[in-house]
Design a protein with these regions (language model features):
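Extended, low-polarity transmembrane helix blocks
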Residues: 1-28, 32, 46, 50, ...
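Hydrophobic, membrane-inserted alpha-helices
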Residues: 54-63
Length: 165
């Protein structure tokens, strides 16, 4: 096994399963997820909760098997950008800080970007099916995930005003 292809396989499995777990966690209690989304400033929170669950389960599954890899990675980048911009950036960098900093979502975003750029490797369905986004489009698709996340924040999120104000 080529070490690069083996490494990409491991990254896809770990990140894919992690993102699937996030989506399943949201999906198990959509009403609770929607209430939390509303509390942290999202408009249309019930829709956002459903979309979050579907996106995370779908993108994680696609990344896991290496199908449409740059698009799956872009969806993960978008999701982590929304998480960083709406919640984690206000709590500093480190994940162990109160409220959880942006360290974790940053790392997931960069790993997803690298996977978008390199593709899923030899052990991905993209390779088996002859799907290749190319050296130019793959990183651009990853960057489009960042733009989609920023767009999501602009359209659907406002920082909540603390109750004491």
């Amino acid at each position: 096994m080529n070490p690069i292809d083996g490494g990409l396989l491991i990254l896809r499995i770990v990140v894919g399963l992690t993102i699937i777990a996030h989506g399943v966690n949201h999906a198990r209690n959509l009403e609770g997820t929607a209430r939390w989304f509303a509390r942290v400033g999202f408009r249309m929170a019930p829709v956002q909760a459903r979309m979050s669950a579907v996106t995370e389960i779908g993108a994680g599954s696609l990344l896991l098997v290496g199908l449409l890899t740059p698009l799956a990675a872009a969806a993960i980048i978008a999701t982590m950008t929304v998480a960083a911009g709406s919640i984690h950036r206000f709590n500093g960098f480190f994940i162990f800080r109160k409220g959880e900093g942006w360290e974790y979502v940053n790392m997931l975003s960069w790993v997803a970007f690298v996977i978008a750029w390199t593709g899923g490797g030899r052990y991905a369905l993209d390779r088996t099916l002859g799907i290749n986004f190319g050296e130019v489009w793959s990183p651009l698709i990853g960057l489009a995930g960042l733009a989609a996340g920023v767009g999501q924040l602009i359209l659907f999120w406002r920082r909540p005003v603390p109750a004491s104000q």
